[in-house]
């Protein structure tokens, strides 16, 4: 099982120390309610070899390597273990010559977001709904002091720990398997990311307030979410599914989203990027057995979802507390 005690020790002397009042008990409770496959997935992490990387690049990729390459047999054993943790959704990872080609080219999103951010050097960062942690490692690559990701999905936790093991057990990033609604208001993070989460929330304004409660005064929110065209009063509430996703509740226009953020008290709210999701950014690979974007779009008109809505378009909004 994954040991969270090193993280407790890390935060004990930081401005996250108040979290220790609740977090250890929450994670003990979490361990009693884990997915039936969690024990198997965590063992896969244990089975991965302890390799030392001579070269690690988190600035332009998430990559580890060493001067003496792995044998083909060693590579195949690692691939076998990593593929037992499929589906790999967010990446890519380049680990000792192994290309983990995930469904999403999350580096595309990072390249769109990064130029607009307050410098991450020396910052304490929270990544909400972090998945397997790809963007967390890129934040570390930008010089973040500490990155904490939260995501309740046990598979993502095990994927993250597998990658960490192949990055010389780097402790600058940590994934905690909780949702933001389970976090006490810490007001301790310099930057809070919420990317690809808001439209899954039944109460989007509550989510925005929860994000605000984790920021220091003056801290920066980085919000990335689905949007639709329209004015300040435009919000799509899909009747049943959106792009085959049942758990999509509210997709606002950019103007409506800015209004929401201002309504819960954020300042300096601005949209810095809008991009339609392409078939190059989200696609099927050998590391994903499920459907992907091509299956969610109208086969005769890729500008629409299979349900007839506009195809996925995502905005990046920055704001300050």
Swiss-Prot record:
The keyword tRNA processing is assigned to this record: yes
InterPro entries in the cross-refs: CmoB, Mo5U34_MeTrfas-like, SAM-dependent_MTases_sf
Catalytic activities: carboxy-S-adenosyl-L-methionine + 5-hydroxyuridine(34) in tRNA = 5-carboxymethoxyuridine(34) in tRNA + S-adenosyl-L-homocysteine + H(+)
Record-listed carboxy-S-adenosyl-L-methionine binding positions: 90, 104, 109, 129, 151-153, 180-181, 195, 199, 314
GO MF assignments: methyltransferase activity; transferase activity, transferring alkyl or aryl (other than methyl) groups
BP GO annotations: tRNA wobble uridine modification
Keyword ATP-binding assigned: no
Sorted UniProt keywords: Transferase, tRNA processing
Pfam families cross-referenced by the UniProt entry: Methyltransf_9
Domain of life: Bacteria
E.C. designation(s): 2.5.1.-
Positions in coiled-coil regions: none
Functional note: Catalyzes carboxymethyl transfer from carboxy-S-adenosyl-L-methionine (Cx-SAM) to 5-hydroxyuridine (ho5U) to form 5-carboxymethoxyuridine (cmo5U) at position 34 in tRNAs.
Subunit structure comment from the entry: Homotetramer.
Family assignment from sequence similarity: Belongs to the class I-like SAM-binding methyltransferase superfamily. CmoB family.
Protein name, entry field: tRNA U34 carboxymethyltransferase
């Amino acid at each position: 099982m994954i040991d969270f005690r090193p993280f407790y020790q890390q935060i004990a002397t930081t401005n996250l120390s108040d979290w220790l009042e609740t977090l250890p008990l929450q994670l003990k409770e979490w361990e009693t309610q884990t997915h039936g496959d969690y024990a198997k997935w965590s063992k896969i992490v244990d089975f991965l070899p302890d390799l030392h990387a001579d070269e690690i690049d988190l600035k332009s990729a998430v990559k580890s390597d060493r001067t003496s390459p792995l044998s083909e047999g060693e590579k195949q054993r690692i691939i076998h273990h990593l593929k037992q943790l499929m589906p790999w959704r967010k990446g890519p990872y380049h680990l000792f010559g192994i290309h983990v080609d995930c469904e999403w080219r999350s580096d595309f999103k990072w390249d769109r977001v990064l130029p607009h951010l307050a410098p991450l050097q020396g910052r304490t960062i929270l990544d909400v709904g972090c998945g397997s942690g790809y963007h967390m490692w890129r934040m570390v690559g930008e010089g973040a002091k500490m990155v904490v990701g939260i995501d309740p999905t046990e598979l993502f936790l095990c994927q993250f720990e597998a990658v960490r093991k192949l990055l010389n057990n780097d402790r600058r990033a940590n994934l905690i398997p909780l949702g933001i609604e389970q976090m006490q208001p810490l007001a301790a993070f310099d930057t809070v990311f919420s990317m690809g989460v808001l439209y899954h929330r039944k109460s989007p304004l509550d989510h925005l307030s929860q994000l605000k409660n984790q920021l220091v005064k003056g801290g920066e929110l980085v919000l990335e979410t689905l949007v639709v065209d329209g004015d300040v009063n435009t919000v799509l509430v899909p009747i049943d599914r959106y792009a085959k996703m049942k758990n999509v509740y509210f997709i606002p226009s950019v103007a409506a989203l800015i209004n929401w953020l201002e309504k819960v008290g954020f300042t300096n709210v601005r949209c810095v990027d809008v991009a339609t999701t392409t078939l190059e950014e989200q696609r099927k690979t050998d590391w994903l057995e499920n459907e992907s974007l091509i299956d969610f779009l109208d086969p005769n008109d890729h500008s629409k979802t299979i349900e007839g809505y506009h195809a996925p378009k995502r905005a990046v909004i920055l704001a300050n507390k």
